[in-house]
Amino acid sequence: MNFLKKLLPQVATEVQQLSRSGFHTSSVCCRVQSGRYRITTKRNRPLTYEMANPPHFIGHRKSWNSWNTSTMKDALRPSQTAIEDVFIRKFVTGTWHALVCSEVIIKRQHNTIRIAALIRQAITPRKMYFLIGYTEELLSYWMQCPVTLELQTVGDKKDVVFKYI
C-alpha cells in the first residue's frame, strides 16, 4: 500500500503530460480536408464540372471515375482491377499527351472495358484515328478483353473549365 501511495503522484504527472501533448490546437491541423480543392490566392486554378463538385455529390451531380463490380464483397479480383485502372489512366494520358482535358472514366461491363474522356482538337483526324486504334489494340492485348474508346472532342482546353478557384 505504501508503494502505491508513492507511485500515484508520478503516474498523475505522466498522464497530465500525455493528455496535453495529444491534442493539437494549431490552425494547420484544422485546415485539412480531403476530396476538395483548396482555393488559390490568385484564383487561377481551373476546375472542370466534375472536379468542382465535392465527393458527397457522387451519385447526384457527378459519377464514379471507375465503374466495376469486382470490388464488391466476395468478388474475384478487386485489387487487380484497381491496379489495371491506374495503368489504363496512365497509358491513356501518356499516349494522348497534352490532349486529355478531363479525367479518364473507365466503365467495365461483363468482359468489355469502355474508356471515356474529353480530347482537345489539336491534331489532325488521321492522327486521332491512329491513336484510337493504337490505344484500343494495345489495351485489348494487355487486358485480354475488348477495349473501346469513347472520346469526345473540344476545341480548346478552356471550354472544359467550369470555374476557377
UniProtKB/Swiss-Prot annotation:
Domain of life, source organism: Eukaryota
Q: Where is the transit peptide?
A: 1-30
The record's Gene Ontology cellular component field reads: mitochondrial small ribosomal subunit
Compartments, record wording: Mitochondrion
Q: How does it assemble?
A: Component of the mitochondrial ribosome small subunit (28S) which comprises a 12S rRNA and about 30 distinct proteins.
Family statement drawn from the similarity comment of this UniProt entry: Belongs to the universal ribosomal protein uS3 family.
What is this protein identified as? Small ribosomal subunit protein uS3m
